Amino acid sequence: MARLRDSRSPSPAGSLSARKRKDDDRRDRDRRDGPVDHRRRSRSPIDRRYRDRDRDRGRDGRDRDSYRRRDRSIDRRDDDYYRGSRRDGDRRRSRDRGLDRLRSPDRRRDRSRDPDREYRPRRDDSRDRARVRREGTAESSSHRRDDVRARDQPKPGNTTAKENEPAKSTPTQPQTEAEKKAERLRKLQAMKQKHALKEAKEADVTAGLTRKLFMEMDQRASGAVVGSGTNSPAPASPAAAESPASPAPYVGKFDPKAIARNAKPARASSPVRLGDVKLGDVKVGAPVAAAASIAGQGKGAASGKAGLLQTGRPISTFGFNKSADALKTTAKRKIDMGDEEIIKRKLVKLPDLALENADDTPYADDDVAEDAEKDFDVLLAGTEEDRAEAQRLLRERREEQIQKESMAMEIDSAPSNIEVATEPVAQNPTAMDVDDEVDPLDAFMAGLEQTASGEESHSKADTLTEKKNGNIPPEAYFSDDDYGYEADGTDPTSILAMASKKKKKDIPTIDYSKLDLNPIRKNFWVEPYELSHMSEEELAELRLELDGIKVSGKNIPKPVQKWSQCGLTRPILDTIESLGFEKPTPIQMQALPVIMSGRDVIGVAKTGSGKTMAFALPMLRHVKDQDPVTGDDGAIALIMTPTRELCTQIYSDLQPFAKALKLRVVAAYGGNAIKDQIAELKRGAEIIVATPGRLIDLLAANGGRVTNLKRATYLVLDEADRMFDMGFEPQVMKIFNNVRPDRQTILFSATMPRIIDALTKKVLRDPVEITVGGRSVVAPEITQIVEVMDEGKKFNRLLELLGELYADDDDVRSLIFVERQEKADDLLRELLRRGYGCMSIHGGKDQEDRNSTISDFKKGVCPILIATSIAARGLDVKQLKLVINYDAPNHLEDYVHRAGRTGRAGNTGTAVTFITEEQENCASGIAKALEQSGQPVPDRLNEMRKAWKEKVKAGKAKDASGFGGKGLEKLDKDREAARMRERKTHKAEGEEDDVKEDAPAEDGEKKDKTKVAIQSAVSAIVSRDASKAETEDKHAIPAGAVKAGHHASSGKSGGALDKAASAISEINARLARAGQLRPGQPIDNKGPDAGAFHATLEINDFPQKARWAVTNRTNVAKILEATGTSITTKGNYYAPGKEPGPGQEPKLYILIEGDTEVVVGNALSELTRLLREGTMAAADAESRAPASGRYTIT
């Protein structure tokens, strides 16, 4: 016998090289003269399986030792042949591994103590015969090792094929309903008796009573033969084969252990098992009787007769119903894979089942291969009729098992009508179709698809089947089946809704009414002694001296006059002193007491008046009074700004105070990496300075777990007028709605138009409004100059101003404002050519570049900065002396903030504005600012303002306030619409279903407008002899309706109108034949190619891309070839808004002529299609085009 690959036998003593040569010679001899014995050459694990089983069954010592030596185990070290040898196991095994060869008979040595070694073939034959007798008994199943069972199992891929293959059988008589009912009652009675027996055993029933019970059971069994005991090593008794073939049915108590212990150890040549079906007239489900009957027919099966099912299946150690449970599991899998059955699920109470009737469904996955092997054995042999009969018996047995379980579980009191959908019997069982095999993964997925419950999870096919088959009894489902999520996942609408919700960046809403929040202290104001004795007259005089402070509200504190009266802590006062702030500014004098008292404040003050310190110092006192921020707590104070530059500036201003008070401040704004800001927030921060967009991103990030506003009690909106503009208002309100209601809100700005008041008041409670120097007023320290000039003279004047500025002092800064990003870069290039060191900043630049540019400008690295209006708010540069508005601002607030970049903190500055004659809309705001600040208005500017007001009154122009807009939500919708149009344009074949059907409303409106325009441009098809009146009537017909014009001679007279129309037609026909063309006459081709029918399509007012689509040679040639018509472009092109005058050529149109109405209609419809597609493409291109083709806003 060939040495096994995993043999652990020691190598013989001697030289390794010599041994290698001997082995090589031995291989040669084996190949040359070795006998051919395929059975012995086979390395199938069957031999080892039965050796292991024999060893377990307790064979005598001689056989056990011989088997062990045949295994070449490590125990053979004690043999004389291997004494003194050294092991070279690794090298020997690696060399012999994978070689299934035979030893030559002439080289067989007497080195083994096993006398039966030479007679292995005979012994193998006897063992094979004994295996047939042993297989199927209780001990053969229970004592088989698990690894042997794993080796015997077939591959999972062949399971379905084996189950579908028919087997031999003999015809049997079907059971009647009465017999089935009686059988079920007997089984139920047997189960109850078994439970009673089990309880009796637990109560320590005497052994005598047990033996008596066993004797009674044996008498009732009438000599039925069962398998031998589990631990009996004795051979099968020959008397067992002579038992009666058809014993009486077993009606007593059914105890498998007792039967197995007291039965005679008999074995039939045909493997049997309790619970198998007898092919005679034995009823399904009578295990003992069936086993006895099959055992009685063992000799016939051994002699070659194929009238018996080959059911060589082991008996489970957990009960005698293991086989039926396995078959039942297979049937359930077939139910899951069927297409015609619908299984309803419902929750039921799980019963307390006996061990023998326990459902093995949870372990079905472990026994799938074994069950498939059993069904294959049943359907293995016999004629076609036998296999069909075997299929029927298996089906009945599965139905019986299911009915039995339903009776035992008592799901419902009513009878169960569950039908098991089994596979039909193959018509040609010998030729199996491999393609019909069900893949295991497909079967598993098919089973999962049926777990969905409810009406929403049913497909159309399931609904039709349900109507066809009627109501089907529900089936229980358990907690492991997750039906809800699977049903939601299969709904495409829910997927789209979930995707859109995820993309929307929603902030998690917080219901503060259900939270137990710690109370906060907002009132820290204690009125100083010096202010308490001040009278009302003195107070009014003081406020007038302080730049005319105006306040509105109730119980307003009196303004302070020095830092010591503000109630600030010592570290804050020390920091103020170190920064060189001698005394508070007017806005600080009045705002600090009001904010310290816990009131909501609206502060309006001129630019450069110290508004940042007015809300920052009370904020520090507010934060220090509360508990420290720990864990997942959010910030206590939140400051929101409209621009990134202002955000960084406030962050820099707070750093000295935060360092002194050991507070953490985080600046969160767009353009920088969000991961760094998230990391800082995770470490904890008491103060956040942010822009609204980035703050929403942080609040919505990771489901709201990055940061939150639960502890935010101090909110500041700097430049509040722009924050509450319609561009920011939706985002700001979304943030306010997630802050606790008892917050303190502070709003500051240099300009506060009345249009914003309504928005600010809805987020404030009993606010105090403080105005210093008036609303939207330029500081008096700023000298304002307005010059009206042409566009070409601006640059020379700019060079002149810069030359005058830097001629006296080099260490000054100048800021130039322009309207557009392109203009900023162009002006930067021109100034660099003239030798001026400058830099530019606008929204198209990267945020890092913007930050570095501002820093270099403040340090004096570049003295000149060119910027758009993003630098108009909050930018504070100490040495900024000159502000030039190269492009005039279009509203008052923008002018005030631009001019306010100079003349800050009491310093002086100059603001120069260039305005052209065409910018009359800007003249009104600039003139108003000059008047409010007490400076003279130039005469030319005043004339422009008056002219603009007259245009507004006449309705020729519309005055704009500089505020309003549709907000970022409108921008998001526009981007989404453009993206969907791009997807439709570039989608591949088969992707039609991926596009949203509910396109944005703008697309629908655009299509409708295009359709209406085309309809108005298309004329009806008329004949050459049709009248003008008739043509006009056809123009009145709704678009798309193509009607044929008919000759006047073909019309039927139907009254006075018809006669009049006929007369007009004849007159027009005579005029046309005479060649007398009249203005507006639709047909103007009198050449030889003129057709009997014609139509016109006006294309003058359509976009250029649409006109090109219907006039280029390629498209026209295709239409001519397809229709055989004549297509001519007529008329002249007129720009939008212009109309052709009397006697001029009409607008550009296309004339289509043909011999028949059909060809003209076909050509007209094709041209209409091209015109529509061109119009839509032009609209899409226009919407996709960025506002500036050079930069991308990040």
UniProtKB/Swiss-Prot annotation:
Biased composition, class Basic and acidic residues, residue ranges: 21-37, 44-154, 177-186, 455-469, 967-980, 997-1011, 1025-1036
Keyword annotations of the record: ATP-binding, Helicase, Hydrolase, mRNA processing, mRNA splicing, Nucleotide-binding, Nucleus
Motif residue range(s): DEAD box: 718-721
Span list, region Disordered: 1-201, 224-248, 452-484, 952-1011, 1025-1056
MF term (GO), any: RNA helicase activity
Helicase C-terminal domain sequence ranges: 797-945
Motif (Q motif): 561-589
Reaction(s) this enzyme catalyzes, per UniProt: ATP + H2O = ADP + phosphate + H(+)
EC number, as in UniProt: 3.6.4.13
One BP term from GO: mRNA splicing, via spliceosome
Low complexity bias spans: 232-248
A GO-annotated cellular component: nucleus
Record-listed ATP binding positions: 605-612
Top-level class of the enzyme under EC nomenclature: hydrolase
Sequence intervals crossing the membrane: none
Domain Helicase ATP-binding: 592-770
Family: Belongs to the DEAD box helicase family. DDX46/PRP5 subfamily.
Described purpose of this protein according to its UniProt entry: ATP-dependent RNA helicase involved spliceosome assembly and in nuclear splicing. Catalyzes an ATP-dependent conformational change of U2 snRNP. Bridges U1 and U2 snRNPs and enables stable U2 snRNP association with intron RNA.
Matching PANTHER family: ATP-DEPENDENT RNA HELICASE DBP3 (PTHR47958)
Name the UniProt record assigns to this protein: Pre-mRNA-processing ATP-dependent RNA helicase prp-5
